[in-house]
Structure formats: C-alpha cells, structure tokens
Amino acid sequence: MKLKQILCSLLCLAATSGVVAQNAVQAETEEQKDKRMEWFDHAKLGIFVHWGIYAVNGVSESWSFHNKYLPYEQYMSQCSGFTASKYDPKAWLDLIKESGARYTVITTKHHDGVALWDTKYSDLNTVKATAAKRDLLTPFVKEVRKHGLKLGLYYSLIDWSHPDYPNFTRTETRYDVKDDPARWQKFLKF
C-alpha cells in the first residue's frame, strides 16, 4: 500500500511538473539584456514628451491637484481647453531628429487618467473628454517610425481619476486597500 502511494505521488508530481515549467517565465540572462539594450548605450540622447491637458493652463501636470495646489474639478476643466489645435507631430519629430536624439518617449496616459488615444477602458481620453476630439498618440507614433527613431510609451499605472484607485490626493483616499481588497483587485484588472 505504501509503495502504491509513493508511486502515485511521484506520477502526479511528474505529470504536473511539465505544466509548471510551461508557465514559468524564462529569466533573461545578463548577456541577453546587454544585447537587447545595446542600442540604448549608443543612443546617448532621447527626448521625453510629457504632454497632456496640463498644458492648457501650464500647471505642473496632475501633481498640481494631487498636491492640492488647485481643486480636482479646476484641474480637469482643462479638458475643455485642450484643443491640440497647433499639434503637428511631423514638426515635433523633425525637431527631435534635428536635435540628434535617437529615441523619444511620450506620455500616453499620466496619473490624471487622461489618455492621448481612444482607449476602450475609459472615456477619459482625448477623443471623448477633450476639445481635441481625436487620437493624438497614433499620429505621433507614425511620425516616430517615419523618422526612424526608437519609441518609448510612458503609461502611468497610477490613475487618480479612476473611482477604484485608492489614493485621490496627497491627503485624501477613497478607501483603505486593507478594508476593501476586492475594490483594489477591481482596479488592478482595469
């Protein structure tokens, strides 16, 4: 009887070990990482484009309401003034390329939750919630590719406008994660 239990246990272990191995993430070696990042060592200069509704009134991006320098409603009212009427991604990329930069990174969504494209996960985006009424990210990405530059996309996981994100401002929270872990999990799935 004991032998049967041991054999059965070993058989189960052998059968499931292949499943676990298939789901394991292969760790990148230092050599693989160096090869993947080689371009970055040679790039020397990159331009980070930090652009969003905060450009309307020239406030210090979404930290201005988070740090309570101005009320959230006043900060978000910039959506109605964010027309992007002078937005010219070709001119931006001409300038970035002329500067000698080899890559650029753009903020696709900052902590305020406003996305520069029509995301299906939120109506808080430049197409549905701003005066621009259009996708501002795709034209930028297309120009980066035309100019032969590397591209980075900055996407903030923090989203102070999302009702399920616990922290609202520096001093205000919507809820305590310990008291409502289901709500936190709901945000994480967002």
Located regions from the model:
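Mature catalytic domains of secreted/periplasmic carbohydrate-active enzymes
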Residues: 22-190
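Bacterial Sec-dependent N-terminal signal peptides
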Residues: 1-24
